[in-house]
Amino acid sequence: MNLETLYSSYFNDLYRYLLSLSCNHFVAEELVQETFFRAFLHLEDNEIENIKAWLFKVGYHAFIDFTRRKNKKNALIEEIKGLELLDNNTPENQFIERDQLSQLIQSILTLPEKESQAILLCDLHQLKMHEAAEVLGLNLNTLKSHIYRGRKKLKTILEKRGILHEEG
């Protein structure tokens, strides 16, 4: 598969993932460019079975490198810009969806890093568990534990914030 085909096939998914990590439209775009640049450099050298998981892993490492360079380990969440929403929604519904997604991502990012990354990859970006485990460099069972604990903590956080109502 050539780079142009990869770009058109995976740009949106990769952009959304990197936006959820960086919480900044411009940083996400820069990271997507960096990811595809790295892919260009290494694509022909490696035989890659699952290209989407590999691109997400490259993107994740580009984000880590960016964070280290900018010393933003504890960066606060900025306003989420440019999220693509369904065209058939009214502007009011789009605003509500964007606000709810923003609150959800803010809540996810309060979790420990491995738990938040596992939830972002599996639940928000719908990677299969084995793909997410590969991206994060974790054993599959370890990833499942992070997802379980993260979802449990996330439910508590969302209930406390009044976003999710307690059952019962």
Language model region names:
Residues M1-R16, S20, F26:
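A short, charge-rich alpha-helical start-of-domain segment used by transcription regulators
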Residues M1-T5, N74-A75, E134-V135, K152-G168:
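C-terminal edge and immediately downstream basic/flexible tail or linker adjoining helix-turn-helix-like DNA-binding
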Residues Y10, H146-R149, K153:
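Residues within the DNA-recognition helix of helix-turn-helix
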Residues L14, L18, L55, G59-T67:
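Hydrophobic-face residues of short alpha-helical interaction/recognition segments
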Residues E30-F37, E49-H61:
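Structural recognition of an alpha-helix C-terminal capping motif at a helix-to-coil junction
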Residues Y60-E78, E97:
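Arg/Lys-rich amphipathic alpha helix in sigma70-family domain 2
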Residues A75, L83-L109:
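Acidic, proline/glycine-rich intrinsically disordered inter-domain spacer in sigma factors
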Residues L109-Q117, H125-T142, T156:
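Helix-turn-helix DNA-binding module
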